[in-house]
């Protein structure tokens, strides 16, 4: 990691081979600065998809965030990503499409989410997959959250950015 001290990495992280035989309640798979590349061009595509597949049998609930959400939707369900004409950047109003879903307990029907991304997945592609349920979207920012496998897989678009993310 270029921003995290090596001692922190050694203390709080492990490699996949040491985890293989274990079961976990939850896993978060997050983004990477590779969203403008085709998935198969990513150097570690084979390794990350192996982890995606492993999580289905060893993890109760998996949260795919940002690039990992697009990658997981593509790998598991064939949902493509699309390049945006210009980078989406800002805070956008979103609505809940399944307001009684437990993940929205305590949420208002409308809520705001920051986005910073060059690519998107589209509502119509998610709706073509019977196993996927669209949970939230924005008129301006598009798809925000989808769920599959009875709430065991959540896919959430990029919801954060740093002060230099507009670059």
What are these regions (language model features)?
Residues 13-16, 73, 112:
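A polyampholytic, Gly/Pro-enriched intrinsically disordered region
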Residues 29-98:
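Cysteine-nucleophile active-site neighborhood
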Residues 67, 158-159:
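Short, well-ordered beta-to-alpha junction loops that form the rim of enzyme active sites
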């Amino acid at each position: 990691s270029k921003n995290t001290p090596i001692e922190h990495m050694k203390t709080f992280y492990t490699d996949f081979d040491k985890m293989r035989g274990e079961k976990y309640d939850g896993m978060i798979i997050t983004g990477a600065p590779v969203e403008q590349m085709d998935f198969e061009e990513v150097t570690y595509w084979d390794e990350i998809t192996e982890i995606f597949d492993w999580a289905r049998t060893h993890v109760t609930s998996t949260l795919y965030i940002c690039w990992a959400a697009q990658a997981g939707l593509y790998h598991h369900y064939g949902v493509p990503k699309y390049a945006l004409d210009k980078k989406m950047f800002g805070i956008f109003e979103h609505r809940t499409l399944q307001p009684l879903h437990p993940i929205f307990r305590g949420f208002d029907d409308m809520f705001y989410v920051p986005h910073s991304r060059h690519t998107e997945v589209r509502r119509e592609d998610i709706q073509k997959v019977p196993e996927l349920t669209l949970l939230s979207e924005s008129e301006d920012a598009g798809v925000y959250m989808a769920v599959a496998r009875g709430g065991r897989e959540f896919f959430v678009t990029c919801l954060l950015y740093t002060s230099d993310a507009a670059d």
